């Protein structure tokens, strides 16, 4: 359970199997280094197991203490205990720190071949959610299958940057007690990550909106969103997404269609000059 993974755990003799991630930290220095490095990237604090505490091992946060040279072993134990006892404890921190550390402890432990993580972005600020996504999709989790439910575009963007060749995105919507599933497979993901305009657009955010309105430019998006907010303020606001010119509508339309996302195309009148442009996006009443 990643919600409680960072809570103190019983000290386990080395001859016995490790019963949890904190016990594993005591035996695997590379595992500790990965966990501490990931946490430091998010919060600028190292993770230090306090093996000197007694029967329970809590996780401390701060800089790893270094004992003075030539200090006898008994004094080293006292020094480390006193120093670490003054450090903040991981399980006393807020929900964001605890959840981040708990997930990192679980995914880096390499104890499970399949994992289900529900909304790992919970309690995290957007930059930390993006970092969490990159950690989840990194090579450190290769060889395992992770099922992630999320409502965070930041988490998804982090995953796309870190491991685009490992990701499939399933969009689930529900209407009239019927679930609808739409899939972006590895090839579709590659189209996004290999195209600079798509990669750095807000396309992923379409997953979390009922409708996306495609416009040619940022100024068009702002203009039409202003009209929407004025005329239809009581209705859910669609995502207004600039595509960078009428010749790029088709790329966005293809991906939105595959994800079963309702969309509208708002183009300038000069799109009518080129039959190819208009045919590429014309679908029932989706073009204005």
Predicted regions, residues:
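Active-site-proximal structural scaffolding
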Residues: 32, 96, 125, 148-149, ...
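Residue-level detector of anion-binding/catalytic polar loops
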Residues: 46, 145, 262
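Extended helical coiled-coil dimerization/tether regions that scaffold
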Residues: 2-100, 105-114, 126, 275
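A generic structural signal for well-ordered alpha-helical segments
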Residues: 39-40, 139, 256
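Acidic, divalent-metal-binding catalytic cores of TOPRIM
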Residues: 157, 172-288
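Switch/communication elements of ASCE P-loop NTPase nucleotide-binding domains
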Residues: 67-205, 222
């Amino acid at each position: 359970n990643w919600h409680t993974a960072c809570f103190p755990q019983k000290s386990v003799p080395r001859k016995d199997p490790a019963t949890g991630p904190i016990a594993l930290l005591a035996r695997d220095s590379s595992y500790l280094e990965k966990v501490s490095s990931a946490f430091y990237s998010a919060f600028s604090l190292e993770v230090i197991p306090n093996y000197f505490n007694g029967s329970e091992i809590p996780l401390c946060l701060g800089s790893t203490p270094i004992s003075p040279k030539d200090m006898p072993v008994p004094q080293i134990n006292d020094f480390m205990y006193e120093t670490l006892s003054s450090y903040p404890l991981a399980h006393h921190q807020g929900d964001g720190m605890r959840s981040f550390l708990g997930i990192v402890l679980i995914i880096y432990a390499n104890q499970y071949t399949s994992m289900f993580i529900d909304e790992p972005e919970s309690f995290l600020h957007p930059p930390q959610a993006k970092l969490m996504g990159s950690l989840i999709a990194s090579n450190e989790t290769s060889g395992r299958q992770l099922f992630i439910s999320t409502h965070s575009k930041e988490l998804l963007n982090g995953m796309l940057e870190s491991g685009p060749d490992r990701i499939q995105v399933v969009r689930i919507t529900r209407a009239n007690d019927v679930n609808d599933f739409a899939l972006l497979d590895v090839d579709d993901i590659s189209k996004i990550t290999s195209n600079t305009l798509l990669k750095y657009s807000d396309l992923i955010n379409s997953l979390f909106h009922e409708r996306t309105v495609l416009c040619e430019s940022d100024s068009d998006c702002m203009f039409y969103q202003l009209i929407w907010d004025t005329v239809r303020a009581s209705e859910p606001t669609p995502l207004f997404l600039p595509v960078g010119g009428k010749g790029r509508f088709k790329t966005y339309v293809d991906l939105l269609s595959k994800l079963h996302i309702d969309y509208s195309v708002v183009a300038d009148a000069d799109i009518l000059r080129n039959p190819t442009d208009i045919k590429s996006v014309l679908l029932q009443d989706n073009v204005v």
